[in-house]
A protein has these predicted regions:
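Bacterial Sec-dependent N-terminal signal peptides
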Residues: 1-26
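N-terminal capping segments
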Residues: 22-70, 74-75, 105-110
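Aromatic- and glycine-rich peptidoglycan recognition patches
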Residues: 26, 30, 108-166
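Short, solvent-exposed loop/turn elements at domain surfaces
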Residues: 48-51, 99, 137-138
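...with weaker cross-activation on analogous glycine-rich loops/strands in unrelated enzymes
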Residues: 66-134
């Protein structure tokens, strides 16, 4: 019975993610893996001043990533054309998110916010790590994000890239 349940769980996980996402999860760049390891080490802890940007700043600088030191965190990717991976960085600008749980509608606003993709749960559905939020304060916390719930604003996703050794 136990083997059957394990087999059933594996099948569910395989078929609940799009094929490209399953393949992508196996091909995570080394830099992204290191960023996720760092994020895991700081969950429920305050990073620097506790600003959302500080988490990405520390992760990118710690592993010598190439970025502009402001809001361009690597290579801009298009989630419609290429898979989003754990360790990718999301920049929100003037974003409004609206979603419903049972009979309650929730609305969230993000004037300027930075987060790191912690897990990919499905196409454009992620668990993100971020701080300076209502739910976790200035400590790093995890929450879910579904890009289909974004009704306004600009969401950019960046793939961290290593600095070239020139």
């Amino acid at each position: 019975m136990r083997k059957y349940m394990v087999y059933r769980t594996i099948l569910f996980l395989i078929f609940s993610l799009p094929v490209t996402q399953v393949i992508a999860q196996e091909n995570i760049p080394e830099l992204n893996k290191r960023i996720i390891e760092y994020v895991e080490s700081v969950i429920d802890k305050k990073v620097d001043r506790g600003e959302c940007w500080d988490l990405a700043y520390q992760a990118l600088n710690r592993f010598n990533a190439q970025w502009d030191g402001k809001f361009q965190y690597g290579k801009l990717i298009n989630p419609k054309r290429e898979p989003v991976l754990p360790g990718d960085i999301i920049q929100f600008k003037n974003v409004k998110i609206r979603y419903q749980i049972t009979y309650t509608t929730y609305t969230e606003f993000m004037k300027q916010h930075t987060a790191i993709v912690y897990k990919v749960k499905g196409k454009n559905v992620f668990t993100i790590a971020h701080q300076n939020t209502e739910f976790s304060g200035r400590k790093v916390g995890l929450s879910d994000l579904n890009l289909a719930h974004v009704v306004k604003g600009d969401v950019k996703i960046y793939r961290p890239i290593p600095k070239s050794n020139k």
